[in-house]
Amino acid sequence: MIKDCILRYQRVLGKRVHDQPGYDTHGLPIEVATEKLLGISNKQEIIDKIGVETFINKCKEFALSNADKMTQNFKNVGVFMDWERPYYTLDPSYISSSWSVIKKAYEKGMLDKGTAVLHWCPRCETTLSDYEVSEYRDLEDPSIYVKFKIKGEKNRYLLIWTTTPWTIPSNVFVMINKDYDYADVEVNGEILVIAKDRVEAVMKEASITNYKILRTYKGSELIGIKYEHPLREFVSAQTKLDDFHQVVDAGNIVTLTDGTGLVHSATGHGEEDFTVGQKYGFPVVMFVNDRGEFTEEGGKYKGLKVRDASKAIISDLKSKNTLFFEGKIVHRYPVCWRCKTPLILRAIDQWFIRVTKIKDKMLNEIEKVNWIPDWGKSRISNMVKELRDWVISRQRFWGTPLPIWICERCNNVMVVGSKEELESIAIDPVPNDLHRPWIDNVRVKCNKCGGVAKRIPDVADVWFDSGVAFFASLGKDWQEKWKELGPVDLVLEGHDQLRGWFFSLLRSGLILLDRAPYTSVLVHGFMLDEQGREMHKSLGNYVEPSVVVEKYGRDILRLWLLRNTTWEDAKFSWKALELTKRDLQIIWNTFVFASMYMNLDNFEPDKYTLDDIIKYAKIEDLWILSRFNSMLKKVNESMKDYKVHEMTNYLINFLIEDVSRFYIRLIRKRAWIEANTQDKIAMYYILYYILKQWIILASTIIPFISEKIYKSFVVNAKESVSMESSINYDERFIDNELERAFEVAREINEASLNARAKAGIKLRWPLAKVYIFIENEDTLAKVGRIKDVLISMLNAKDIEISKIEGFKSFSKYKVEPNRSIIGKEYKSMSPKIVEYIENNRDIIAMDILNKKQHVAKIDNFDIILNASYVIISEETVEGFISSKFSKGIVVISKEISESEEEEGLIRDIIRRIQFMRKQLKLNVLDYIEISMKVPEERVKTIQKWEEFIKSETRASNIILGEAKGDITMDWDIEGESYIIGIKKST
């Protein structure tokens, strides 16, 4: 919806918008879902039971079906994009274009094959990149201490700790830090080598109290010591590794936060183990296959799943008396982000793109991008600083095939950059569908020896697909289109995509174009439940958008979401949706009011222009016009940085607070006047002008209700509000001084309401006079400019505006001794000081206010009294009520005259009659006849105000006596009974 709002906004600005939607259709999630549909559970079954061709077709069918469902969901909430022309990453043209990135990486010397220890999913039988290892579970694993016997010594052992017993069969060497202090520790007649600083913790964990440190020494003394592998007789392959079983220095890789300070190292199952092993020339030992099972070389453990093998390994260690201690540990362990299987580390051959070569360029390009909010830049920069080479190959089926062919004769590597290039060198016909298994059958002629080259079986990391969208989505001739459209103006996704899509786009852009492919990145938050938890069906807190749409409609959902600060998570709230519904009702009613009165007066907006009528506008009309243009200006500034939430709040708050709750209340009486005066025409035109432009802009947020309002409200409307263009703000009509004056007026109104409440004076009762005292000349001038508006707002006969000094005639000072402070300071003298203050209040107050202090002579002592000792407050004189606002004070009389009370009563009666008109669903032009039964003492009052009542209620006649009509109601007004009947005049 955020994307949709931004695209709609750019359209109403008159811009040509590239709004092609797209779907990532490859990858493990679709493979796993397809496996479930086919009733299979592993990779081998795809090959043996289903067949790769059938499986690929089913994956494609599943992906396209889900894409269609997503399209309908997007359309349902008003997402307006080019749905007839989406891109799919499975399209042959997309795959063909994407190959150009891999070809470019090869040409730059960034693509090669290498061995590395990587996370591997034994269920999915594929590797995972670092950024794919993002999901963890709390798992319970063994926590064991194992004794490695030192060769040539009778009872001396290296003590190691591990939580992965299954890696011990692949052990090659032991790592230490030569600069640490180590100790020979005697336990039960055996000598254990442990880092000195870990002895106490290890013995405590093993519940051993009877031990003795025989000596301590530097780790350098251990370097080169050889040991016997504890499982040598169970794993025959270990007999070939005897020469490598020794202690080596690994520096700070070895820590003293846990373990023993000696680290068992399996070069095939640990990244640091692999790195250190390479440094010392040790072999890469890995006895585990793609399914996570021990191979033939695993000896006794052949065929066992590695995690299952741990139990057997521990049992064998016990039998050989090499298990020192066995415990359990619950720790955060990485699982496959798709199937949730615990991952393992394996040393495997993979294809890499050496992106570390362009790390500095990436960081430079990040600086050039507009990141919204700013913290997006620091997060992605920190990630790039820790960048590692990209493992691009995956051992799966449903993905973009890697365009790498290797000659069977000379091992020459050939990388293809497009389908067209492949066709030019292919020995076999190139299929239209570039997926496996069809692409696997295409051989090419080696450009080095003329031999036959075959494609490697791997597919690309699924993030490769999304990372090339900026150009691959443009089709076959993407180079020409990119010249016209590139770079991408905006990329928008959730904050999780900083390490996902945003990064993969950046990476591909640097490889292909030597620059970031985008100029701005906007990050959005996620939907949480009311407690701030992530929504999951498994937690029972997930709310389907369709349920919200069914209950409240699309626009309410859109408005509520778009109001939330874009990059912050939003807490779902039914109450917030209900409040949003009320706001939409206010918006609707605002247009109903405008339409009704304009239609009644046959107002024709196309006969006028703003420049023509502006000279007839009243001060409140100029104010709303200024507020509108100021709002447009703010929207314009906010949307330069795509701050959708700011635009949404500016638009909605303007219509509700400025137009509906303020301006319309000010102009309602003018709209009721029969004659079409020039100022009334000006009022109508300005209201029409701002509402028309408002609904055009609002269509970017609430398109459904905007479409309905637009077609019924706008004269000579186009086919759709989406075909309209928005105007820019006009500086000529922005009057900041006037806006500030009205802000003060609103404060004055609030202060007046507060004063009325204190005095118990109803709002409908007019005030004879309101006194307004202003603190500074500038504000005084502003308020003076809108005196007539204030009279109407305050329901006053007159107002008097003057400087703050004038308030003195309505105030007096209340002076009280601060007894606690005086008592602490003056002890025994305090009663006399308090008495003095109470007897000299006025002079003390004047001195402190004017001179900051008053000097009192008490018992021949000069006592200096200031604001710490004397509490001075200002009170309003008897008969009046005051209320403060930020720029001054409002004063009203507590007393209401008989005439004012009468007018208040009449207004209460009018309000009841207008309510009854609504109950009869009368048109605003319809006349009525009124009959009333009122208290006898009120008859003369009604007769006195008869013409006023008739004009305000559109009544042709008022009869006092028995109440009758089309509707009759009994009203209690100020404790008196008024029975009122009305009927439509014939």
UniProtKB/Swiss-Prot annotation:
InterPro entries xrefs: aa-tRNA-synth_Ia (IPR002300), Anticodon_Ile_ABEc (IPR033709), Ile-tRNA-ligase (IPR002301), Ile-tRNA_ligase (IPR050081), M/V/L/I-tRNA-synth_anticd-bd (IPR013155), Rossmann-like_a/b/a_fold (IPR014729), tRNAsynth_Ia_anticodon-bd (IPR009080), Val/Leu/Ile-tRNA-synth_edit (IPR009008)
Motif mapping: 'KMSKS' region: 534-538
Keywords: Aminoacyl-tRNA synthetase, ATP-binding, Cytoplasm, Ligase, Metal-binding, Nucleotide-binding, Protein biosynthesis, Zinc
Main localisation: cytoplasm
Enzyme class: ligase
Known function: Catalyzes the attachment of isoleucine to tRNA(Ile). As IleRS can inadvertently accommodate and process structurally similar amino acids such as valine, to avoid such errors it has two additional distinct tRNA(Ile)-dependent editing activities. One activity is designated as 'pretransfer' editing and involves the hydrolysis of activated Val-AMP. The other activity is designated 'posttransfer' editing and involves deacylation of mischarged Val-tRNA(Ile).
Organism encoding this protein: Saccharolobus solfataricus (strain ATCC 35092 / DSM 1617 / JCM 11322 / P2) (Sulfolobus solfataricus)
Catalytic activity: tRNA(Ile) + L-isoleucine + ATP = L-isoleucyl-tRNA(Ile) + AMP + diphosphate
Location(s) in or outside the cell: Cytoplasm
Needed co-factor(s): Zn(2+)
Family, as annotated: Belongs to the class-I aminoacyl-tRNA synthetase family. IleS type 2 subfamily.
Annotated residues for binding of ATP: 537
Name under which the protein is recorded: Isoleucine--tRNA ligase
GO biological process: isoleucyl-tRNA aminoacylation
Classification of source organism: Archaea, Thermoproteota, Thermoprotei, Sulfolobales, Sulfolobaceae
Enzyme Commission code(s) on record: 6.1.1.5
Domain remark text: IleRS has two distinct active sites: one for aminoacylation and one for editing. The misactivated valine is translocated from the active site to the editing site, which sterically excludes the correctly activated isoleucine. The single editing site contains two valyl binding pockets, one specific for each substrate (Val-AMP or Val-tRNA(Ile)).
Keyword Cytoplasm listed: yes
NCBIfam families: ileS (TIGR00392)
Disulfide bonds, paired cysteine numbers: none
UniProt subunit comment: Monomer.
GO cellular component: cytosol
